[in-house]
């Protein structure tokens, strides 16, 4: 894969953009790739949603998500969230998604029933954190949006830093840099950083 990811916060926009980068631009084929789990939307870096190959989502997220997770941690106190609440959100998400993908409203309903009050930005924050920690990812199209799925069941096994790069960060950074320069060049190291 020459590219690593493309920004994808606007789902219809990123589907169209991805389709335009294929030999036969067809948004239906992009949706089919999402449904098959070959491409995925995730939060690998900068607190932004990206569309990327499923085989790259976990290792890139493990490599790049620490700054956005630190920034998110600073936003928790005003939301009334702490690590205990996030642990409960993760536990309930793992249980709720164990039988397969579910919609965001369904997951937020599970959190509401668990006393986690997902309104007022709390649900988004909990979901962002679980995606940036490679616990949950966007999964198949449900007709109006993407359902949410467990990374462990939706993304390829062995696609983490340990599986792809023997846990070594330097070869992973080199791969990411090579792909960045191939898709964005000419560019500098500062551009990459």
Set out the residue ranges of the language-model regions.
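Phosphate-backbone binding and catalysis cores of DNA-processing enzymes
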Residues: 1-119
């Amino acid at each position: 894969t020459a590219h690593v990811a493309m920004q994808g916060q606007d789902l219809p926009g990123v589907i169209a953009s991805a389709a335009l980068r294929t030999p036969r631009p067809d948004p239906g084929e992009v949706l089919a790739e999402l449904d098959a789990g070959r491409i995925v939307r995730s939060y690998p870096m900068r607190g932004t949603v990206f569309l990327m190959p499923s085989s790259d989502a976990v290792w890139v997220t493990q490599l790049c998500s620490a700054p956005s997770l630190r920034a998110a941690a600073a936003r928790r106190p005003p939301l009334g969230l702490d690590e205990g609440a996030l642990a409960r959100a993760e536990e309930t998400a793992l249980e709720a998604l164990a039988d397969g993908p579910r919609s965001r409203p369904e997951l937020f309903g599970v959190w509401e029933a668990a006393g986690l009050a997902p309104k007022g930005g709390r649900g988004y924050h909990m979901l962002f954190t679980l995606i940036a920690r490679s616990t949950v990812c966007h999964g198949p199209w449900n007709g109006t949006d993407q359902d949410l799925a467990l990374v462990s069941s939706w993304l390829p096994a062995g696609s983490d830093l340990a599986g792809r790069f023997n846990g070594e960060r330097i070869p992973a950074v080199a791969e990411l840099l090579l792909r960045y320069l191939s898709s964005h060049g000419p560019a500098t190291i500062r551009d990459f950083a």
